[in-house]
Amino acid sequence: MDEFHRYGKEDSSWQQCFLYPLFFQEDLYAISHDHYLDGSSSSEPMEHLSSNDQFSFLTVKRLIGQIRQQNHSIVLFVNCDPNPLVDRKKSSYSESVLEGLTLVLEVPFSIRSKYSVEGMNEWKSFRSIHSIFPFLEDKFPHSNYVSDTRIPYSIHPEILVRTFRRWIGDAPSLHPLRSILYEYRNSSESLQRSIIVVPKVNTRFFLFLWNNYVYECESILVSLLKRSSHSRSLSHGSFPQRTHFHRKIKNIFLFSRRNSFQSIWSLKDPNIHYVRYGERSIIAIKGTHLLVKKYRYYLPIFRQCYFHLWNEPYRVCSHQLSKNCSSSLGYFLRVRMKPLLVKTKMLDELFIADLITDEFDPIVPIVPIIGLLSREKFCDISGRPISKLSWTSLTDDDILDRFDRIWRNLFHYYSGSFGRDGLYRIKYILSLSCAKTLACKHKSTIRVVRKELGPELFKKSFSKERELDSPPFSSKAAARSQRERIWHSDIPQINPLAHSWQKIQDLKIENLFDQ
């Protein structure tokens, strides 16, 4: 593998390298077999992992050679033997073949992505979920058009093969990939045989397919983002439109006099901002009405033609977002644009002007959150807390940990809002629901539970909340923090409530297209 990396770096035509002979390297399947054992050791019983089970690389080679045949490739996904030992051995060969195929395809993909990133050094992009919050504060309110696009998990097998065919010149190496994808589609229980439903399992093969597909989807926007990045520091047209521009003065881009005309011309291009999390992406465009209208019309058509989606164009769902509300990371955020008066003063007080601009003022959406809590049986439709009966079989620590995790994620996400009265109402609902759940489990009352547990209820969240609300700064900085908005984007994992809300939104979109 290291030699292949070195040859690919020295030779510019590394895309034409022959990948098919790599499928027959024993070292490759030794690595993939070790990966499979490491991944299955935590879930398989120890008696099933005895040393008597011999793994034959010759069998794997024969399976690779016969993979084009219908009766051999289907064994990769269908195991009919109920015996767990035989079933595990079949799965071992299947997983090794998939792991080996993934390792071979990852080599040219890693080289390709490395060269692509090195060629985009001038494009200062933020590749973290923490960049979503600055995007909502700085870019979202000042954009003319904001669209929410959902990339489907259901992808036709031929589309995946064609994405690899664009940058891999060795066509025989893609025949096993095509056979595996089509056999998986035929062996699945889905009624829609024209697509492949990528399962939400943590397998390296399907994760690699999904990452490669998303990489291709984002590649069509790279040239547009690179072009708009030259005027990113002046994206709003004037500094007063930034609330705290004195903190961002170091990011000012000074144009030279020689390139002044070219820089002014680049400011006429629309500023495009792109954010993606999972299968959802947000594109914000700022520019003239005519340019925004053209981008709204041509971007979906170009995406469909680029990925050969003209047979099912509805699978890429895109709709315009309202500036009064937005959704990211599976959460829902209500926005209020508040007018802000900004005074600008030149040197020696030669010129003083008052400018009125809009400020991003997020609000905690009480009604949608209460509705979501009622669907998950934490409260009724009016917001009265009830016990979570499905959790009464858990231990006390598990119940407290689950409620603590839900509240901590909600608090961290909505901590950037000015008005927190609604957020503390949500905390009251969750804390009382937790107390009722414990009381129902022990067949006691809430008063007895509170007396026994005391400060243990949401102890982690309360301590974290005090730490966030009272930072160890000076008195002047602490007073300023009371007036300013602070985003605490410490979200270790997505809230289960966010998944439930996202499923409801996706179901509404699918029902809309089915009508």
UniProtKB/Swiss-Prot annotation:
Record Pfam families: Intron_maturas2 (PF01348), MatK_N (PF01824)
GO biological processes: mRNA processing; RNA splicing; tRNA processing
Any Gene Ontology CC annotation: chloroplast
Subcellular location field: Plastid, Chloroplast
Domain of life: Eukaryota
Transmembrane segments: none
GO molecular function, one term: RNA binding
Keyword list, A-Z: Chloroplast, mRNA processing, Plastid, RNA-binding, tRNA processing
Predominant location category: plastid
Function: Usually encoded in the trnK tRNA gene intron. Probably assists in splicing its own and other chloroplast group II introns.
Sequence similarity: Belongs to the intron maturase 2 family. MatK subfamily.
Protein name: Maturase K
Taxonomy of the source species: Eukaryota, Viridiplantae, Streptophyta, Embryophyta, Tracheophyta
